[in-house]
Amino acid sequence: MPEIIFTGSAGRIEGRYHPSRAKNAPIAIVLHPHPQFGGTMNHPIVYQLYYVFANRNFSVLRFNFRGVGRSQGAFDHGQGELADAASALDWAQSINPEARGCWIAGFSFGAWIGMQLLMRRPEIEGFISIAPPANLYDFSFLAPCPSSGLIIHGDKDAVVPHKDVTGLVEKLKTQKGITIEQRIVPAANHFFDGKIDQLMAAVVGYLDKRIEGGGDPKSETRGRRSGAG
């Protein structure tokens, strides 16, 4: 698990990178929760997401947003953090020029940043969005959502009420050409205390289905966009 440093618009950004042995392996970027509420790339959910992708032969990167850990800069209320995520994807693509696809995964604040990056980077073909803060941030930029993905949350989330996430999912489900799947973890709060195993089981089930459905993530997404599946 090499420690890496790459350059963002606010200076150096620290990360952890797992390279796949396959030159054409897909890329995954994992984004951590809110920097001002203890979010770092070493958060347990971020850490486990990282290994879910690594164990499926992705080249995967997690990193600290600006102002967190050894990453330079200061919290920028989302705009700068989106730039950090774009820089992370640029870095990963620069050392994986033959990558056959790209996924984005994020938890809470990181889910919001990840969905914004999804809109700006058409090469992102799949996403995992955990506890997206639909009541705290504007998600109307997802018009339309360009890729299929998974939204997962707990039904006892007091930070982001169940109804707000479900409302977001229902809006996205009306769009043609993509498939948005929703998973609800029973009795789970916003941080999935005591429920991380169930959370990861849902993530693994979805990701494996996407990979196996088309031989690799990219071909599965193409099938969904063309109306297959």
What is each of the regions a protein language model found here?
Residues F75-N96:
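Alpha/beta-hydrolase active-site loop
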Residues G106-G114:
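Gly/Ala-rich beta-loop-alpha elbow adjacent to hydrolase catalytic centers
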Residues D155-V160, H190-F191:
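Acidic catalytic loop of the alpha/beta-hydrolase fold
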Residues M1-K23:
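N-terminal cap/lid segment of alpha/beta-hydrolase-fold proteins
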Residues R21-R62:
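Short, surface-exposed "cap/lid" segments of acyl-processing enzymes
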Residues C145, L150-H153, D157:
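Short beta-strand/loop motif that positions the catalytic acidic residue
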Residues L172-F191:
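Catalytic histidine neighborhood in serine/cysteine hydrolases
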Residues N96-F107:
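Alpha/beta-hydrolase fold nucleophile elbow
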